[in-house]
Amino acid sequence: MTRSLKKGPNVADHLLKKIENLNSQGEKRVIVTWSRGSTIVPAMIGHTIAVYNGREHLPIFVTDLMVGHKLGEFSPTRTFRGHAKSDKKSRR
């Protein structure tokens, strides 16, 4: 079930304040955040947001196609190292 339209998007207050301050000053800086559940709103377009994935902050440049998605969708938390290779020498 999707979020009700009357509630509006879920964006962390501290993150929205930082974005609005940078927009009013006309600056573009990397914004560091741990808020993976925040929804990307049109005010964030053009900013680079470093989202925490549990180990490091991954910089994400926000484009207009990302609006409506969550920040956590663009910083994967798991590293896939490939499936186990079949070792034919140990089978003999």
Swiss-Prot record:
Family, similarity comment: Belongs to the universal ribosomal protein uS19 family.
UniProt GO molecular function: rRNA binding; structural constituent of ribosome
Record localization: Plastid, Chloroplast
Main location: plastid
Gene Ontology BP, a term: translation
Gene3D superfamilies reported for this sequence: 30s Ribosomal Protein S19, Chain A
SUPFAM superfamilies: Ribosomal protein S19 (SSF54570)
GO annotation, cellular component aspect: chloroplast; mitochondrial small ribosomal subunit
Keywords, ordered alphabetically: Chloroplast, Plastid, Ribonucleoprotein, Ribosomal protein, RNA-binding, rRNA-binding
Protein name: Small ribosomal subunit protein uS19c
Organism encoding this protein: Spirogyra maxima
Function: Protein S19 forms a complex with S13 that binds strongly to the 16S ribosomal RNA.
Gene: rps19
